[in-house]
């Protein structure tokens, strides 16, 4: 019985670590409370060489999004990062290095990752951001401590496109549209031609279904003004 209970507890903790929607360790924002048809487009892991195409499309459709950027990639593509800001999109912190070992880092190392990314954002973009998205959506007590120490708002999602895992564009598109509802926060990545092609079709869908969009900045501002 003890072994069973321990196993169940361990499974729950592991599941809670990898499913940001459960809010097991961190009370992340995963959806906007709203009665109207509006959603948020969020892009992780940029800026990259693909980001300008995404920006061109968003500009053409007059849509604002939120980009959760990696510090070292901001350093690699400073002009692209500055363009994201100049075109009115929201910015979030996605750590400096997006380490594959994120779930195993100490709280002090996580604080360092977040603060170093903040420094790059400030230096190159001349802005500050209160938003943070955990790499891979992984949360645990150390990450929770780091978020509290750095005074960030953790932003998750309720529609995960799996665009870095699924190769078929149609399957990604169907996965998003099937799970979409009022206030959804969609997780995408501005890192491939594949996701760009999905975005083209997704924006047409949003237009047909009369969805508007919101950014993390506009969501927080509207909440503060309620």
State what each model feature region is.
Residues 180-219:
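Catalytic grooves of carbohydrate-active enzymes
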Residues 54, 205-208, 226:
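Catalytic-site microenvironment of enzymes
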Residues 138-140, 144-179, 211-223:
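His/Asp/Glu-enriched short active-site or ligand-binding loop at hydrolase and phosphoryl-transfer sites
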Residues 13-102, 113-116, 120-123, 127-129, ...:
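Active-site beta->alpha N-cap acidic-glycine motif
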Residues 43-45, 69-71, 93-95, 134-136, ...:
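A cross-domain feature marking catalytic cores of carbohydrate-active enzymes
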Residues 1-12:
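Hydrophobic membrane-insertion alpha-helices, especially the h-region
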Residues 46-49, 69-77, 101-108, 133-139, ...:
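Acidic-and-aromatic substrate-binding clefts and catalytic sites of carbohydrate-active enzymes
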Residues 56-59, 63-68, 89-90, 107-138, ...:
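CE4/NodB-like, metal-dependent polysaccharide N-deacetylase domain
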């Amino acid at each position: 019985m003890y072994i069973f209970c321990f196993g169940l507890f361990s499974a729950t903790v592991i599941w809670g670590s990898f499913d940001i929607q459960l809010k097991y360790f961190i009370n992340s924002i995963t959806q906007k409370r709203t009665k109207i048809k509006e959603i948020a487009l969020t892009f992780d892991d940029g800026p990259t060489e693909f980001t300008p195409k995404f920006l061109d499309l968003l500009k053409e459709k007059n849509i604002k999004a939120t980009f959760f950027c990696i510090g070292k990639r901001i350093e690699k593509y400073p002009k692209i990062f500055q363009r994201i800001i100049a075109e009115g999109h929201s910015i979030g912190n996605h750590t400096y290095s997006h380490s594959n070992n994120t779930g195993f880092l100490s709280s002090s190392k996580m604080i360092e990752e977040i603060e170093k990314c903040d420094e790059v954002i400030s230096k190159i973009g001349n802005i500050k951001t209160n938003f943070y998205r955990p790499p891979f959506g992984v949360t645990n007590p150390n990450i929770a401590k780091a978020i509290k120490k750095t005074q960030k708002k953790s932003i998750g999602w309720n529609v995960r496109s799996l665009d870095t895992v699924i190769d078929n564009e149609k399957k990604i598109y169907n996965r998003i549209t099937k799970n979409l509802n009022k206030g959804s926060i969609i997780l995408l990545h501005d890192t491939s031609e594949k996701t760009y092609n999905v975005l083209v079709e997704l924006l047409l869908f949003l237009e047909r279904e009369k969805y508007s969009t919101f950014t993390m900045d506009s969501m927080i501002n509207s909440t503060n003004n309620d």
